[in-house]
Structure formats: C-alpha cells, structure tokens
C-alpha cells in the first residue's frame, strides 16, 4: 500500500508531498467503508473521438483516500485505417475494440459540506484489437495487443443528494504499452464525468 501511495505522490506535484503522504497514511488507520463508482471519460485517438466507460469498487478511508479496482471499455465506435499482410480488408478500415482492468487511488485534498476536490490516479492493463470485414463480408478480429495506461486527473464532486456524488474533471491518458503495435497516438487529454454511490454511509445509517 505504501508503494502505491508513494507512486501517486510522485505524480501529483501541485501539492505538498509530505502533507499528502502523511494524510494518506493517517487515513489508512481508520476503518474503511465500501465505495462504488461509474464514470465516463471522453478523449481522442489521433483525430478520432472516443468515449471510455468504467465501473469500479473499492474502499474509502475516512473520505480522504479511496483505493480499488475497475473495469474499463471503449463505448463508442472508433474506425481506424487498417492494412493487413495476406488479408484483404474491406475499405481498408477496422473498428477498434478495447477493454482493460485498472487499479485506482484517489486522494481528496479539499472537503466541504456539499463538494470536494480530488486527485484520482489509475493504472490499467488489458487488450485491444480491430474488428474488420474481409472482401467476402466475413467479420474477423486482428491478433489482440496488450495495452497499458496511466491516467492522472483532477476532479470536483458535488454531493447535493444524500449518498450520491456527481463529479466533473480533466486529466491525461498516457499509453505505456501498445501504441506502436496499434499504430496510433493514444496519449491525449481526458475529460471526465463520474457518478459515485457512498455505500458506507447507507450501511451506517441503516445500522443506526
């Protein structure tokens, strides 16, 4: 856990490193509660618009640090040029398919009654391939390529409805593996919309 926290600190230089480290470590001394999220991230692949969706579950430590796992998938049709050796491709294009698992950590550095500001960071690894049609009209998939991403961001969240958080943010997607084999530029700004459910608060209220 300390190594994960340290990595997040190194990638969030806008804030005091020692304060960030201390607050995160102190939050891990509290009893965690369950948290879940659904988010949408809009971005680009070279000159093509793309939308990623993700769902995640994790643990919330004192509303300061959240850690967990997520599943991400490409939710829009992204058509890219495609040429294959020994295979004729209809229109010389294919549809990108991509999905990956992520580990995420989120540090909330400012909390008010109805809103908060956070630095979420996620690292993901998964697979991508192209689905194309042959000249005869058959659907085929290219060989899957391993992809890996690092995605830091800055988000603002509003909790006007009890147990529910709605947020907006911006960040950057850095592709660590796969860009050369996919022959495209996946490094790009990311614009986020997220929906979060505070299950821990629900459970606490039910028990009380």
Model regions and ranges:
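Bacterial Sec-dependent N-terminal signal peptides
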Residues: 1-24
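Short glycine/proline- and aromatic-enriched beta-strand/turn motifs that initiate or cap beta-hairpins
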Residues: 18-67, 196-208
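Transmembrane beta-strands of outer-membrane beta-barrel proteins
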Residues: 32-38, 67-69, 101-103, 117-123, ...
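Residues that define the transmembrane beta-barrel architecture of outer-membrane proteins
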Residues: 32-34, 49-53, 97-101, 115, ...
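Transmembrane beta-strands of outer-membrane beta-barrel pores
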Residues: 40-44, 71-77, 123-129, 172-176, ...
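Outer-membrane beta-barrel translocator domains and adjoining extracellular loop/strand segments
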Residues: 48-50, 80-85, 129-138, 178-185, ...
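Gram-negative (and chloroplast) outer-membrane scaffold detector with strong preference
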Residues: 64-137, 158-160
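Predominantly the C-terminal beta-signal and adjacent terminal strand-loop region
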Residues: 155-208
